[in-house]
Regions:
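Hydrophobic alpha-helical and helix-loop surface patches within well-folded domains
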Residues: 20-33, 93, 113, 217, ...
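Long, ordered, helix-rich scaffold segments
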Residues: 388-389, 518-520, 533, 538-542, ...
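Surface-exposed beta-strand/loop patches in extracellular or lumenal glycoproteins
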Residues: 72-92, 185-191, 460, 507-529
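A surface-exposed beta-strand-loop module
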Residues: 84, 90-153, 209-211, 549-559
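N-terminal, polar/Ser/Thr-rich
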Residues: 17-68, 154-158, 178, 475
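Beta-strand-rich binding/interaction modules
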Residues: 94-99, 474-475, 485-567
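Extended, low-hydrophobicity, Ser/Thr/Pro/Gly-biased non-transmembrane segments
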Residues: 74, 133-239, 261-264, 481, ...
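Bacterial N-terminal signal peptides
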Residues: 6-16
Length: 907
């Protein structure tokens, strides 16, 4: 999520603890809480006391806001303690006792502040074994998607858990850290009309009292608290068959009436799981795999609970006739990521949150590998390119995190789930895999999983396992990417001297955009592999650049190469600055010698040069006509982003007509040929490119014919959803709204109110944020404060409006004027994201306003300070880029048809 995933929840009645869970209607009063006799722990619990097993029993009713629980915790005490500290948040302790040395004694609750619950004893206990019994009550949220929460679908209510990163403590007292990894016994007391799911298959089910049933699940393998999970409600079960060495049963769990929408998930899930098992050469570690649908969107997207993956239904349920290409590819990627976690994160768990990358980066890396293996025609070797680009963009900021960031506060735990951990981590893994070889890397992965199965691991453990079979200690080089932020910029020059082999001169520094206040004085140990023309064909050579400067001899070159690609396969996590005419030579004849991923990578390098101020935007725009005719969808789509990204800040109003005319001249014929509607026999590339090209020409190109057609087709789609292809509808609705009037707004608003399909409802709500008429947009923004739609959905109106220069001010002032009301309605800590409403600004006045308004407010939300710092830095960089590039852009659009030589050169 960003993600953002982990559900942990365990239930269980302990035989030794004869506590009966009170009904939610008549919960016992809370026990008296004492003041702490000594200061409680700060961020981490004392490892001298460890759990060895949990037995948890929960009584949950999806229609109610409270639950009751009883938990028994087997303990191993290494030293005497008089107060035992556990994690617990917003729990009301009703009874507690401790068994030690054959005796039972009272355990008195002790106030530990927001995150902790203490239990004091009449005398010190330990060392030795003990058992803590606790009865308690807690809250079920309809606002948040953490701990235990409940959501409504039609007339039904569903209760689900989400415990990652540290939210199991909202559901039960526990040692809520990943290193405390032990078996769990879970029991749920639920209404007879509800289904109950957890990490393991059901062991037994019996009738309870007053219309309830008691469902006991098999004991789990060792799990940290964040990976325990439950789901309760009138779910339906879709059998997806069995797969793998152990014939693992796979099921799709959906809200009532949604079974028909699980077709694709049921078809694909077993295939993905089987491919993962074959790569790891380790059987799927758990007894079953359920994928459970959460009715509403959440802030975590999907969660890799062992044996019970959870995800928002919008991610994996669709009516068969509405399965778009993006939906199918999206679910396959989600499944590969979450199922990959069953090995990376579940079987082997990081010891502490500073190594979150061992879960998320590895799961992201294996996703690309599995999808490329399964469907090579989908991305043609480019699965990692877009995610890598996202990471490099984030990593160019001074406020960027390290992959392995020290954890000093709750903020750091939450901030760890970002593109640095996921995408940068995956890119660095791919780079070192390429350097040491795929087979050796795969053996290292197998060794890592085997050595640490059912336990915990650290970065040191992982790197030792990867390097064991290679004869290389990769830890020093790898750690330079783990333990410092930033992206290397490698400047490359070609040296050809008579009597010696050609060489590449190399130098490195941190890549920083124009205007950055950061220091470029950083050094990595960078694996650099270059491919080049050698007179007879192509050859490659590699070197580990460990110092500020270095060189790479092109050992197979028979003469000075006609071209050199300094980042073979685009697998290196670095940007390239080409000296002299190297870039021009590489792109001669359209760069036909380059693989698709490499061509995209070179374009990304060009964009980086523009961002750094080392290449003028006007020069890049000279490349656009040729790039727009490229046969590869990915190149054309990248080109539309280059052109479309100009409109917000670099095109003055006086030159908007020239800008629009340029877009129509370059892309117009293709857009008109494509049209808004798909045609029989079209391939997937054509269907996918339509939204990018037609959307650009209709919007930034101001094509009135395409705009009118978008409005007409929108009205038709509102009556018949088959009228427009599912891969195009979002762009079409946006274009229609941008030029739409009050009547169209009323139609879309009315349709959103009536829509029962979750995906279509969300897209209609978001579309209401795309209208440019101020009066219409004011009415749309007001919906974010009404009870007409779920606040998590209606806030999309504000985000859509903030992305458009003509409505950004309205959206930003709406957030400022209604900040407190929004915070009351939105999930807890959602306020951390609200500074991003000002992210699109590009001037000093708005920058100062954003900082003044959010500086103090952001500190009250977990992760808020970093979000604000990111937003402010992005505004600063936009101001600097505008200062460097606006003259070049303006000069180009004053004479867009005049040929200008593009200087690809040097620093």
């Amino acid at each position: 999520m960003k993600t953002l995933r982990c559900l942990v929840f365990a239930l269980l009645p302990l035989v030794a603890c004869q506590h009966q869970v009170a009904t939610t209607a008549a919960a016992p009063e809370s026990a008296k809480v004492q003041a702490a006799p000594s200061p409680p722990p700060a961020l981490r619990l004392d490892e001298a006391t460890r759990p060895t097993r949990y037995a948890l029993k929960l009584k949950v009713i999806p229609t109610e806001d409270v639950f009751t629980g009883a938990i028994d915790i087997d303990l191993a005490l290494q030293k005497p303690v008089s107060t035992l500290w556990l994690n617990g948040t917003e729990l009301k302790i009703q009874e507690a006792s401790l068994e030690f040395g054959g005796q039972s004694m009272a355990a008195s609750p002790v106030d530990g502040g927001k995150e902790l619950i203490g239990f004091s004893f009449p005398r010190a206990i330990g060392p030795g074994k003990a058992k803590l019994h606790v009865k308690y009550a807690g809250a079920v949220s309809t606002r948040d998607s953490r701990g235990l929460f409940r959501q409504q679908e039609s007339d039904d209510w569903y209760l689900i858990s989400q415990f990652e990163s540290h939210y199991a403590r909202l559901a039960f007292p526990c040692f809520d850290e990943p290193s405390f990894k032990v078996p769990w016994q879970v029991t749920l007391e639920v209404r007879k009309g509800d289904q109950a799911f957890s990490n393991t298959p059901v062991a037994s089910e019996r009738d309870g009292e007053d219309g309830f049933k008691v469902v006991t699940f098999r004991e789990t393998k060792p799990l940290p608290s964040y990976l325990v999970a439950i789901g309760v409600g009138p779910f339906e079960v879709v059998d997806a068959g069995r797969t793998g060495r152990n014939a693992t049963p796979v099921r799709i769990i959906v809200p009532r009436g949604k079974s028909g929408e699980a077709r694709y998930a049921a078809e694909v899930s077993p295939v993905i799981l089987d491919l993962l098992e074959k790569y790891f050469d380790i059987p799927y570690p758990y007894e079953k795999l359920d994928v459970l649908s959460i009715p509403l969107p959440t802030n975590f997207g999907a969660m890799e609970n062992a044996g019970l993956v959870t995800a928002s239904q919008i991610a994996f349920l669709a009516k068969p006739e509405r399965e778009s290409i993006q939906f199918r590819r999206g679910y396959a990627g989600l499944a590969a990521h979450e199922f990959g976690h069953m090995w990376f994160g579940d079987l082997v768990t990081m010891a502490w949150w500073d190594d979150t990358w061992l879960n998320e980066a590895l799961a992201s890396w294996i996703t690309s590998k599995i999808i490329e293996q399964w469907k090579p025609d989908w991305y043609r070797g480019t699965t990692w390119i877009n995610s890598k680009s996202r990471a490099t963009s984030e990593d160019s900021l001074v406020t960027a995190r390290k992959i392995r960031q020290p954890i000093d506060s709750e903020h750091d735990i939450v901030n760890a789930f970002d593109s640095i951990t996921y995408q940068k981590g995956a890119a660095v893994l791919s780079m070192f895999e390429h350097w040491i070889g795929e087979e050796a890397f795969q053996r290292g992965i197998h060794r890592y999983l085997q050595q640490h199965a059912w336990g915990n691991a650290t970065a040191r453990d992982f790197l030792a396992a990867i390097g064991a079979d290679t004869g290389r200690d990769i830890a020093p080089a790898f750690s330079t990417f783990l333990d410092q932020p930033g992206l290397p910029l490698v400047t490359v020059g070609l040296q050809c001297e008579r009597g010696s082999k050609p060489k590449l001169s190399l130098s490195q520094e941190r890549y920083l955009p124009a205007g950055s206040q950061g220091s470029a004085d950083q050094v990595w140990q960078v694996p650099i592999c270059a491919r080049y023309e050698n007179g007879k064909g192509q050859a490659r050579d590699c070197v580990l650049l460990t110092q500020k400067t270095g060189e790479l001899e092109l050992a197979s070159a028979q003469r000075c190469p006609a071209w050199v690609l300094p980042n073979e396969g685009e697998l290196g996590y670095y940007r390239v600055l080409y000296s002299g005419d190297l870039l021009a030579r590489l792109l001669k004849d359209g760069g036909k010698q380059l693989a698709l991923a490499e061509r995209i990578g070179v374009l990304d390098d060009v964009n980086a040069l523009v961002g750094r101020g080392k290449m003028l935007y006007g020069e890049v725009l000279q490349l656009v006509p040729a790039l727009s005719k490229d046969p590869h969808r990915e190149i054309v789509t990248s080109t539309t982003r280059i052109v479309g990204g100009l409109k917000s800040h670099l095109i003055p109003e006086s030159l908007r007509p020239s800008y629009a005319q340029f877009i129509r001249r370059v892309f117009g014929a293709r857009a008109r040929k494509l049209g808004w509607r798909s045609k029989p026999g079209e391939d997937e590339d054509t269907r996918l490119i339509r939204a990018a090209v037609v959307g650009l020409v209709a919007d930034a190109g101001e094509d009135r014919v395409l705009q009118a057609e978008a409005r007409r087709l929108t009205r038709r789609w509102l009556r018949d959803c088959s009228a427009v292809d599912a891969d195009t509808i979002d762009t079409l609705l946006s274009v229609a709204a941008q030029s739409g009037d009050q009547a169209l707004f009323v139609e879309i608003h009315s349709a959103a109110q009536k829509e029962t399909d979750r995906r279509d409802r969300v897209r209609l709500i978001q579309t209401m944020g795309a209208f440019r008429d101020p009066a219409i947009e004011k009415a749309a923004l007001a919906l974010a404060l009404s009870n007409e739609f779920d606040p998590r959905d209606s806030l999309r109106i504000m985000w859509r409006a903030s992305a458009e220069s003509r409505t950004r001010d309205m959206a930003y002032h709406f957030v400022k004027q209604n900040f407190d009301r929004l915070i009351e309605r939105l999930p807890r800590d959602s306020g951390a994201s609200l500074p991003a409403a000002g992210r699109g600004y590009c001037d000093g006045d708005h920058r100062r306003d954003v900082e003044a308004f959010f500086k103090d407010r952001s500190t009250t939300f977990t992760g808020g300070p970093r979000t604000l710092a990111n937003v402010l830095e992005q505004i600063d960089l936009c101001v600097a880029l505008k200062r460097v590039q606006e003259r070049s852009v303006e000069a180009f659009f004053r004479q867009p048809e005049r040929p200008v030589r593009a200087h690809f050169g040097s620093n």
